[in-house]
Amino acid sequence: MINVRTLSEAQTHASLDRFAIGFDHRDRARLHELWDRVLDSERWSEGEMVAAFESAWGAWNELDAAAFASWSGAALAALEFAGVRGETILCPSNTFMATPLLALRAGAKVEFVDCNRDDLCMSFADFEEKVHRHRPRAAFVVHIGGHVAFEIEQIAELCRVEGIFLIEDCAHAHGAEWNGRRAGTWGDA
């Protein structure tokens, strides 16, 4: 483990370089032009640029798209739409704490579902058992590590059969595919 407190500035930059995300600096002028358009419009949300993003993102995913300022806002809107107040929501055990906390904020009771070792995503076997035990109104499935949950097809089918509102968290899997389908195409939100 690297202790950044004991490294020189040069050593710190060298250590962090391995985590650098590639950025083509030739795009800098275009990026700043787009930021200026947003700032000049004085519309941080629901403006021309957001509409353009929603259109492009929806076309790329072949889904309807609605942009939110944060995942939390989008998740709360989906939970409200699903009518979870007073109901149970199933949540994978391997997720950021915001997932169950938002369910609690929406007035739901949270039950956790174990995750598989091979994909670190929700286990269908445990999901099925929890569905029959708790009769949830909704469920979160979180695609972890840049790939789609390996058992998403079974999870989504059981949700359809049981009338469970399925919310896919695809923040870690933009563009990832499973059996020819992109992340985000199995759930209700």
Please describe what each predicted stretch is:
Residues 120-188:
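Active-site phosphate-binding strand-loop segment of PLP-dependent enzymes
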Residues 68, 72, 93, 97, ...:
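Glycine-rich phosphate-binding loop at the start of an alpha helix
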Residues 1-84:
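Conserved PLP-binding active-site segment in aminotransferase class I/II-type PLP enzymes
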Residues 57-58, 103, 159:
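A generic structural signal for well-ordered alpha-helical segments
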